[in-house]
């Protein structure tokens, strides 16, 4: 009340005025904060777009262009090895491979390929990964031991992955009328997985159909195999040119003799030489896709993320190829002189990898 002598009335009026002004100021700030929030969200979205564009720019940058070229060329070379038998195998060679002399020639190539695979694993891939693991570990011996155990686990993972691929794509769809061949000559043609020709009792048409299916299944397995090779080649070039070149050379040493066997299987399935060559050439697409997949999924943290798992994983895959697909064919040799020649060729393959390591940087 005006003119009220009570001091409490003046204090209450001042408090009411203060609260009113404070409420008006808060409402004004709340109304003005919405544009600020909208601008903050727009800025965050802009940063995300910039980050995504930077990642794509780094993927297609000039520094990565060299890796793209080397990886695609290496994968293409591995894929084109399927056409190589067309250049060296005469028309009658398909029949010659079924003989004992042809099987022995194939085992000679496989012995050299086995040495190249083992040399690449134990002289290049695993030492490179081991040295990197020991050098970058910041902790004590416990953390270093843990890193080394992870390296061993990646080797086992690579071995089991290749085992699973062979189980799924080679053995799951075998025709019941096709029994495994006991002939070591036939087994040498396709890594121990050549099948005996079914009996002609159901009719010639059924025989031809079964042979065609076996040829197409072999092409499917070859495409999957080339995809894993493309992964290995591209991932190795992401580490260094030296590792990439050595890996490509090791794959070629393994692939060329096996492609001869795959080519013979296609001839046996009823394809002519040119059709078999074109089908083998089409499997090279799997290697290119594998190389692109490996590069596009590369971690932005750099090469160190690749070395940790790619090198031991690839080593496990190569060990599976060498010890499961190649070595059993060589153990079937009974002649001591031929066995000695196989051991010498195996050592020659290892020596080639040693020389490549010394002269290729």
UniProtKB/Swiss-Prot annotation:
This is Zinc transporter ZIP13. Keywords: Cytoplasmic vesicle, Endoplasmic reticulum, Golgi apparatus, Ion transport, Membrane, Transmembrane, Transmembrane helix, Transport, Zinc, Zinc transport. The chain crosses the membrane at residues 7-27, 69-89, 109-129, 151-171, 233-253, 276-296, 307-327, 340-360. Residues 1-6, 90-108, 172-232, 297-306, 361 are lumenal. Homodimer. Belongs to the ZIP transporter (TC 2.A.5) family. It comes from Mus musculus. The lineage of its organism: Eukaryota, Metazoa, Chordata, Craniata, Vertebrata. It is a multi-pass membrane protein. It holds the Pfam family Zip. Changing residue 74 to D: Partially rescue the unresponsiveness of osteoblasts and fibroblasts lacking Slc39a13 against BMP4 and TGFB1. A motif (XEXPHE-motif) lies at residues 254-259. Highly expressed in some tissues such as bone and eye. Expressed in osteoblasts of tibia and of alveolar bone, in proliferative zone of growth plate, and in odontoblasts on the forming of the dentine of crown in molar tooth. Also expressed fibroblasts in reticular layer of dermis of skin. Residues 28-68, 130-150, 254-275, 328-339 are cytoplasmic. Its main location: Golgi. Disulfide bonds: none annotated. One of its GO terms (biological process) is brown fat cell differentiation. Functions as a zinc transporter transporting Zn(2+) from the Golgi apparatus to the cytosol and thus influences the zinc level at least in areas of the cytosol. May regulate beige adipocyte differentiation. InterPro entries: ZIP.
